[in-house]
């Protein structure tokens, strides 16, 4: 980041650090659209951009005059560390007159980079100032214009720059004095100038609450911008706009698998859904498996329902396998959980018929047997007549046995019993809607001490707290008892074997496609979990956070959609992304209204 000035440096002083924290919070609240990595805010006066007669102290916030002060040639000014970012929309700072000195020849205002610092602000081109001795405003000229009252010791003078209409007004002791300057150029710096001995001023760039209620003024302009957006003329295109918006909402619901909601929305708006209901449910259930940490089952389901998808997406396959290894460490993947979890015979497994998907058969080209000497566990997705299936990436495997040995399995048969067609009309039956809640992720007690509550997922949504988090009441008691692979020796051996297969897959992909730094880091991070006695509390332990499943879940869902010639991202999200980029572009071209046109202000 660019120079922030002494006013932003942390020290060992707790009081100073508290003030710095307060400053950061206040600036974020006042200027939420500003990205300080790109355009830092002024936080102090610059020790490098001042005339020699200026002295700085108190973290470069206090300015005192140290020249002779005989005439105007002894004037001296200092600029802030950075110019005012356009993304502020409205920017404000205050200066307190600690001492008016001998004559009170002080100027407060703005100037561009390169303006002579041996002058008071306002006397030169691209320089603007309000002077205390006569109350005049100076706009790039040595001749001032009557503006406001004089100011002296104890007064607080504020300077507000409106980057929306490019004007500036001043305040005195919390009261606005009216507009002083118009048609201001961009990239102006807060500036203060002194001319006679004894003059001392303190700046407040947000270190303390302002005397003037700048937030109320900002609220007025925020309301103006929002009203302008709301009144944007649509005219005769209203019908077209409504149709576009309805399609965007519908595609968003379909993309994320909210099947019943999508069907209800289609009926209400008399629109069509561009994906058959069975396909939506298949994607929904695969996502649920990933979010529940049952990645092996999700891989098998994907291979059965969408043959060839992972074979043609080796990067995605590798990501999934690395995540499966992490879930093995966590004790949540079926490959290791079956060693320590006993459940009643499964009554719902994938059917062995090609009817499991309207578009795909039941073949499983990616599965590869682990061999007779290795323990095998069902992921609950292998058809009874297909225990083994090979793919070209022979270094990795998904062990399978009879579905009856599955610790938990998923019913796909009901949702596929309805013969759905593409572009379903809005008259879909209620029976199709209610099947959204068919799948349950059963209550299972893992031997690592983490209990997952029964999670019934309704209407395409999941109970985030239940799927992604352990029972709050048991976390404190069980964190210390969590063990690798649930503490089961056979499960640990299976995990190690899987790790070897994963290493083999990595080497095979490297030979076939060349080195991949992302794959290398992914594998190293996953394997690094084994270097710690408590993987959940180690430098790479964030991988075990259930929230980490969401990225791979999204990637898999997008790949499935893309394989069916559907958008891999919902148009609604693309539109939001484009709007966000446009607002950021407005900031780069110094359009101040971007500050009050942020996309998240319109999301409810």
From Swiss-Prot:
Domain B30.2/SPRY: 23-210
UniProt xrefs under SMART domains: CRA, CTLH, SPRY
Family the entry assigns: Belongs to the RANBP9/10 family.
Protein name: Ran-binding protein 10
Signal sequence range: none
Any single GO BP term: cytoskeleton organization
Any coiled-coil regions, as ranges: none
Gene name as annotated: ranbp10
PANTHER family, sorted: RAN BINDING PROTEIN 9-RELATED
Cited SUPFAM superfamilies: Concanavalin A-like lectins/glucanases
């Amino acid at each position: 980041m660019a120079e922030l000035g002494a006013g932003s440096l942390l020290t060992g002083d707790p009081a100073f650090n508290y003030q710095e924290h307060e400053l950061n919070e206040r600036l974020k609240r006042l200027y939420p659209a500003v990205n300080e990595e790109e355009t830092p805010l002024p936080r102090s006066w610059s020790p490098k951009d001042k005339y020699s007669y200026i002295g700085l102290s108190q973290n470069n916030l206090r300015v005192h005059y140290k020249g002779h002060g005989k005439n105007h040639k002894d004037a001296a000014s200092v600029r802030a560390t950075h110019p005012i970012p356009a993304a502020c929309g409205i920017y404000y700072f205050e200066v307190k007159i600690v001492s008016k000195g001998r004559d009170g020849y002080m100027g407060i205002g703005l100037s561009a980079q390169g303006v002579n610092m041996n002058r008071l602000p306002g006397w030169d081109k691209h320089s603007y100032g309000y002077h205390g001795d006569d109350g005049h405003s100076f706009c790039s000229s040595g001749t001032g214009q009557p503006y406001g009252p004089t100011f002296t010791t104890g007064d607080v003078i504020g300077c507000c720059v409106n980057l929306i209409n490019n004007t500036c007004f001043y305040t005195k002791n919390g009261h606005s004095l009216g507009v002083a300057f118009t048609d201001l150029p961009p990239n102006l710096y807060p500036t203060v100038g002194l001319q006679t001995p004894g003059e001392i001023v303190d700046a407040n760039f947000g270190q303390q609450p302002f005397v003037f209620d700048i937030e109320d003024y900002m609220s007025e302009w925020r309301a103006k911008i929002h009203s302008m957006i709301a009144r944007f003329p649509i005219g005769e295109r209203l019908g077209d706009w409504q149709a576009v918006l309805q399609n965007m909402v519908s595609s968003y619901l379909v993309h994320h698998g909210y099947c019943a909601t999508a069907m209800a929305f289609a009926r209400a708006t008399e629109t069509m859904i561009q994906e058959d209901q069975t396909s939506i449910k298949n994607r929904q259930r695969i996502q649920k498996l990933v979010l529940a940490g049952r990645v092996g089952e999700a891989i098998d389901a994907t291979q059965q329902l969408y043959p060839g998808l992972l074979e043609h997406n080796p990067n995605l396959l590798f990501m999934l396998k690395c995540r499966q290894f992490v879930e093995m460490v966590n004790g949540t993947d079926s490959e290791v959980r079956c060693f320590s979890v006993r459940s009643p015979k499964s009554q719902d497994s994938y059917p062995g018929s090609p009817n499991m998907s309207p578009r795909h058969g039941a073949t499983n080209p990616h599965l590869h047997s682990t061999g007779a000497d290795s323990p095998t566990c069902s992921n609950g997705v292998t058809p009874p007549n297909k225990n083994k299936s090979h793919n070209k990436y022979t270094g990795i495997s998904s062990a399978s046995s009879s579905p009856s040995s599955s610790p938990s399995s998923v019913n796909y048969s009901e949702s596929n019993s309805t013969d759905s067609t593409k572009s379903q009309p809005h008259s879909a039956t209620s029976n199709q809607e209610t099947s959204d809640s068919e799948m349950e992720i059963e209550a299972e007690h893992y031997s690592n001490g983490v209990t997952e509550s029964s999670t019934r997922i309704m209407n395409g949504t999941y109970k985030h707290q239940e799927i992604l988090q352990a029972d709050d009441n048991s976390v404190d008691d069980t964190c210390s008892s969590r063990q690798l692979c649930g503490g089961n020796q056979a499960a640990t051996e299976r995990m190690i074997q899987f790790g070897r297969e994963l290493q083999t897959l990595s080497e095979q992909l490297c030979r076939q496609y060349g080195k991949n730094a992302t794959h290398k880091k992914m594998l190293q991070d996953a394997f690094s979990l084994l270097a710690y006695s408590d993987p959940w509390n180690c430098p790479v332990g964030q991988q075990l956070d259930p929230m980490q499943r969401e990225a791979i879940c999204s990637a898999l869902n997008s790949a499935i959609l893309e394989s069916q010639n559907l958008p891999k991202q919902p148009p609604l999200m693309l539109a939001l992304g484009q709007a966000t980029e446009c607002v950021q572009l407005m900031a780069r071209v110094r359009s101040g209204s971007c500050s009050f046109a942020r996309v998240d202000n319109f999301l409810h």
